[in-house]
């Protein structure tokens, strides 16, 4: 008795690539587009006004400096002032338990109407202002910290100007992505006959149906 093997069986036994997988190697590679995660949500103002966390943070409440908690108070005071002059500070909004790493422009500009880090505005206090994106919304921290107690009061405001800038960038990003996807479909979309159609139409080596007789 003779045993016959088809090409697929022989290829599998020899560790070769089966015919159908070998054919896939000749397909034209398609481009891969990476859509960067948006920095902001589509309607920032609406989220700022309706989100419970933002509503709580928008009301002025107690804040505390949280850096170097294990150090003596005198050293913490010195480090807080040094950090502020370098352009950053670790602040906690006590009521909500929200910890913030603030960054701001510590360079004193005599022509600016308001400083991001102002030691001169009020004796014994530093007034801070810092803009950042929180939960997809552009906000601005505004408040003060007592240089002796290392606590104070602050709130979060909606940063209208930066929100508009981020919205414009978001729309450009979406438009660019859609254009690239449309161009990709136009270039690389080639109609292909489904594999099962070979059986219905009588592919190579297969008998044709009644209509082909």
From Swiss-Prot:
Belongs to the CBF-beta family. It is found in: Nucleus. Residues 189-213 are annotated as: Disordered. Regulates the DNA-binding properties of Runt. This is Protein brother. Keywords: Nucleus. One of its GO terms (cellular component) is core-binding factor complex. Residues 203-213 have a biased composition (Gly residues). GO terms for molecular function: transcription coactivator activity. InterPro entries: CBF_beta, CBF_bsu_sf. Transmembrane segments: none annotated. GO terms for biological process: compound eye development; regulation of hemocyte proliferation; regulation of transcription by RNA polymerase II. It comes from Drosophila melanogaster.
């Amino acid at each position: 008795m003779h045993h016959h093997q088809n090409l697929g069986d022989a290829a599998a036994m020899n560790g070769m690539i089966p015919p159908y997988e070998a054919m896939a190697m000749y397909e034209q590679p398609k481009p891969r587009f990476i859509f960067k995660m948006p920095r902001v949500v589509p309607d920032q103002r609406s989220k700022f006004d309706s989100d419970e966390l933002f509503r709580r943070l928008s009301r002025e409440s107690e804040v505390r400096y949280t850096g170097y908690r294990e150090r003596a108070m005198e050293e913490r005071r010195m480090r807080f002032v040094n950090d502020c002059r370098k352009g950053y500070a670790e602040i906690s909004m006590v009521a909500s338990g929200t910890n913030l790493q603030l960054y701001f422009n510590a360079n004193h500009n005599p022509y600016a109407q308001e400083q991001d880090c102002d030691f001169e505005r009020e004796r014994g206090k530093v007034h801070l202002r810092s803009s950042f994106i929180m939960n997809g919304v552009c906000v601005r921290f505004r408040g003060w910290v007592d240089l002796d107690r290392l606590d104070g009061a602050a709130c979060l405001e909606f940063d209208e100007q930066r929100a508009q800038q981020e919205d414009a960038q978001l729309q450009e990003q979406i438009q660019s992505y859609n254009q690239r996807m449309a161009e990709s479909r136009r270039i690389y979309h080639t109609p292909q006959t489904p594999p099962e159609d070979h059986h219905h139409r009588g592919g190579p080596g297969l008998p044709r149906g009644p209509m082909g007789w």
